[in-house]
Amino acid sequence: MQERKRVLVKFSGEALAGENGFGIENSILKFIASEIKELIKNQIEVGIVIGGGNIIRGVSAAKGGLIKRTSGDHMGMLATVINAIAIQEALERSGLEVRVQSAIQMEAFCETYIMRRAQRHLEKGRVVVFAAGTGNPYFTTDTTAILRAVEIDADMVIKATKVNGVYDKDPKQFDDAVFLNTLSYDEAMQDNIKVMDDTAIALAKDNKLPIVVCNMFEEGNLLKIIQGDTSLCSIVKNN
């Protein structure tokens, strides 16, 4: 019997907003649900981390000086809970079993994060959506994604974004930007390479956890990647 794969998919909050740039676009929720459903159909265990940038970012909230960075980050954590509940609804409407687990206790809305409980949910075929970041300010949701992936013993992290993968410089600004299909953890931490923040990449490196960056709007892309086709994405791993 083939061993079941376990993955953690990281979605940016901005992606949920679509062309609006703010809030949650129902059509994108439906698309995400259909993509995740294909993974579950193929006996893949799925955890999800979602950002909160479509509602508020802690760094941005603190820029004016009125709101402290810690308070801004707390607001950002709450934004991820809003997004997690939205994704839960979309997944459940598609026929999947889902649990939201928050790093901050809020029993009226969702479970509190417990590593072993999350693992049991995954083993039973439920999708687990991890909300409220790490529960601590100054840590990004990218770092949350790596941390939760390590804790649940995921085979890889897939960062589903609005671009095809990683370039040596910003392709929107430079026509000669080169697409990087494979790169090392150390290369991913270079200033001109924007994969994740250094804390997230260092944690992935320490645990030999592959990071795949792909276009979330490419239909069937997530399943292809997990099945071994990384031709349309970038992968960060040991050389």
Curated annotation (Swiss-Prot):
Q: Could you name the domain of life of the organism this protein comes from?
A: Bacteria
Q: Answer yes or no on keyword Cytoplasm.
A: yes
Biochemical pathway: Pyrimidine metabolism; CTP biosynthesis via de novo pathway; UDP from UMP (UMPK route): step 1/1
One example GO MF annotation: ATP binding
Keywords in alphabetical order, please: Allosteric enzyme, ATP-binding, Cytoplasm, Kinase, Nucleotide-binding, Pyrimidine biosynthesis, Transferase
Task: Report the NCBIfam families cross-referenced here.
Answer: pyrH_bact (TIGR02075)
HAMAP family for this protein:
PyrH_B
Q: Which family does it belong to?
A: Belongs to the UMP kinase family.
What is the protein named? Answer: Uridylate kinase
Q: Which organism is it from?
A: Campylobacter jejuni subsp. doylei (strain ATCC BAA-1458 / RM4099 / 269.97)
